[in-house]
Amino acid sequence: MTDAEIENSPASDLKELNLENEGVEQQDQAKADESDPVESKKKKNKKKKKKKSNVKKIELLFPDGKYPEGAWMDYHQDFNLQRTTDEESRYLKRDLERAEHWNDVRKGAEIHRRVRRAIKDRIVPGMKLMDIADMIENTTRKYTGAENLLAMEDPKSQGIGFPTGLSLNHCAAHFTPNAGDKTVLKYEDVMKVDYGVQVNGNIIDSAFTVSFDPQYDNLLAAVKDATYTGIKEAGIDVRLTDIGEAIQEVMESYEVEINGETYQVKPCRNLCGHSIAPYRIHGGKSVPIVKNGDTTKMEEGEHFAIETFGSTGRGYVTAGGEVSHYARSAEDHQVMPTLDSAKNLLKTIDRNFGTLPFCRRYLDRLGQEKYLFALNNLVRHGLVQDYPPLNDIPGSYTAQFEHTILLHAHKKEVVSKGDDY
């Protein structure tokens, strides 16, 4: 399925974002190097003034508080159109009651689109992953007004939805740099960029893949096509296994040639899309990317992240590597830690993140020091869950694309769609 098959809502328009007029600083070193050498020398002798980024808080850009709708798609299953009049009225009433919720989701989606428009062309080989993560997250903080959690009355009201995933090559997910990481993005790398925005706990989860070497183009095309196939198949009363089957069929129809070797693109069969719940990135339902026999159905009003991962490896990931991602446990544990440091850290986590995922860098930013022992203590007590990087076999390459969708009574809304993917 292609992007052209998705019909944009007139209200959405998803128009180009003139970020230059909003004052987003563009660091284009290449152009500076190509400038006249005499003028360049003069400029270097002048005192450099740091440009101030004027990314505006999103509320200032939409003073009426109404945010653009996503791209609308019809349900293609007949049974979604067979509602009785009473049922139609009931679902319409529910949609009206959910208006504030939908608007929060759309607000997060608009921020996500603006952030990726600001950063996508600035991701180039030679950058440290740490700098890429900071660029994405600081832009998100500026749009959401969550630049200083310590100064916010409610740090969980809106801001970053989860740590920025910057997973390279055979690592498919759950990698973000910890303090001191010096990893540099290379021309031959394939990097999954997965970041989130949340407004009142309503999370936008959307991801894309960056590569520079054209030999990976077919890998990215396969995964993007598979993701849109999943979006097309999704709908009220649709069985999850049927979505996975459709995704698998499309993904496996692609081949990619890398360094003279031809590989079938395989779905990473133990990675899934998922429903999203308030302040919980994984809401309870998993959307497979292979046929798995799960007859659970999607329901009206649900909020899903449809994501697919394709690999040139075995199509199966295992956990391994230094942990960076954490989240408060979904289970209600009565046992509390005995260490004072662990108790204090838990209070910091509860106040600033609640059940939203976080990473070590976020604790660093809050001024936490020497907290790793306390954090591991919380993990051992089951109060915090750690999420190690997920890897296919070394030497393989993985790609990811993802969108957040809303299931309305009569249509689905691809709320995070932009003009880029």
UniProtKB/Swiss-Prot annotation:
Residues 28-40 have a biased composition (Basic and acidic residues). Residues 1-53 are annotated as: Disordered. A divalent metal cation 2 binds at residues 205, 274, 307, 402. Binds 2 divalent metal cations per subunit. Has a high-affinity and a low affinity metal-binding site. The true nature of the physiological cofactor is under debate. The enzyme is active with cobalt, zinc, manganese or divalent iron ions. Most likely, methionine aminopeptidases function as mononuclear Fe(2+)-metalloproteases under physiological conditions, and the catalytically relevant metal-binding site has been assigned to the histidine-containing high-affinity site. Also zinc has been proposed to be the physiological cofactor for yeast. Irreversibly inhibited by the fungal metabolite fumagillin, an antiangiogenic drug. Subject to product inhibition by cytosolic methionine. It catalyses: Release of N-terminal amino acids, preferentially methionine, from peptides and arylamides. It comes from Saccharomyces cerevisiae (strain ATCC 204508 / S288c) (Baker's yeast). SUPFAM superfamilies: Creatinase/aminopeptidase, Winged helix' DNA-binding domain. Cotranslationally removes the N-terminal methionine from nascent proteins. The N-terminal methionine is often cleaved when the second residue in the primary sequence is small and uncharged (Met-Ala-, Cys, Gly, Pro, Ser, Thr, or Val). Plays only a minor role in N-terminal methionine removal. Less efficient when the second residue is Val, Gly, Cys or Thr. It comes from the Eukaryota. Its cofactor is Co(2+); Zn(2+); Mn(2+); Fe(2+). InterPro entries: Creatinase/aminopeptidase-like, Met_Aminopeptidase_Type2, Pept_M24, Pept_M24_MAP, Pept_M24A_MAP2, Pept_M24A_MAP2_BS, WH-like_DNA-bd_sf, WH_DNA-bd_sf. Gene3D superfamilies: Creatinase/methionine aminopeptidase superfamily, Winged helix-like DNA-binding domain superfamily/Winged helix DNA-binding domain. Belongs to the peptidase M24A family. Methionine aminopeptidase eukaryotic type 2 subfamily. The keyword Cytoplasm applies. Substrate binds at residues 174, 282. It is found in: Cytoplasm. This is Methionine aminopeptidase 2. A divalent metal cation 1 binds at residues 194, 205, 402.
